[in-house]
Amino acid sequence: MAIRPGEASGRASGRTALETIGLGKRYGRRWALRDCTFRLPAGRICALAGPPGAGTSTLLSLASGLLRPTEGTVRVCGESGPAGRARVAHVTQGKPLYPRLTVAETLRLGRELNPGRWNDRCAEQIVRDGGLSLGARAGVLPEGQRTVLAFALAFAREPELLLLDDPLDGLDPLDRHRIAALLLARSAERATTVVLSSQALAELDGICDYLLVLGGGRVRLAGEADDVVGMHTLVMGERRGEGLPREIAAHTVIDTQLSGRHFTALVRRKGPLAPGPWEAAEPSLEELLLGYLRAPGAPGLIAPSAEPVSSRRPHRPGGRPGIPGMPRNGRPGTAGVPGGTPHTSYHHHSGKGAAA
């Protein structure tokens, strides 16, 4: 994927925007997030995905300081505690706003609550470009304009890390397109790192260049989007027995979809895929995410780009630095996910990668 304008300096410096080590949050006896370890380099737009209850909202709240961790650490731009939280803006689910305040009053309140860290020009331009009336009350704004106002409050703080919890939820296709364009343009201006949680997987493909997938409160998949997608192949063909052909089963099979006599399999390659009576293609970002979401027992993957620097073991002759138990360079591993088998579902459909 192309590097956004203004992003190159953040990438070249190797800076880290968000890093967690063994992060966990427990409510009573239930762990909402457990053993969460990853690194997000600066300047990325990261897709955060997971099924309901996966821990995505919990992770964002821990990163912004809304929640305290039960265990582990979280650092923003190398800082923990108040110093790290000062670098974050967080748009939570539902985009809560004071309904009786006008747009102008909402922006004024934002300025008063963020002394010394507020860009009036940025806030006003976002509101103006979004077609909002300064006299309109926040409580009567349509959903798309509520999102624009929430983004104005967030970007006006000039955060280094912007956390967005399902901001596209409830928007019509036109509003989603407008909000995505706003996000890309504004984050590019200051090379703001963005973590975007969304259930609209198709929308993430043209926005995000980094992936983080949670499942069961644990990290399932993390790394540069191009690298992670490139490690996988979508294979489609006709079944000639009960299972997959052995040439395909020899790789790490993440997810298999069966329709009549045909199969579609998402595999993480261990090497070159042998030729055969099947078609092979690189999966789209949506197909990759769907495969991992449908297969909670399949081996996870933490790419080298997502390994926290502070937890890497010293290099030893004959070995590679990394995190114990996590795969390196695309090799199979559990990445903290209990062992299990790849997911297979039976349904009637035509077309590759359809959801079960």
Where are these regions (language model features)?
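Conserved ABC transporter NBD signature motif
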Residues: E71-G84
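Helix-to-loop junction immediately C-terminal to a conserved catalytic motif
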Residues: S64
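ABC transporter nucleotide-binding domain
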Residues: H177-V267
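Catalytic Walker B motif of ABC-type/P-loop ATPase nucleotide-binding domains
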Residues: L162-D166
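The feature captures the beta-strand-to-loop junction immediately N-terminal to the Walker
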Residues: A49-P51
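ABC-family P-loop ATPase nucleotide-binding domains
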Residues: G94-L149
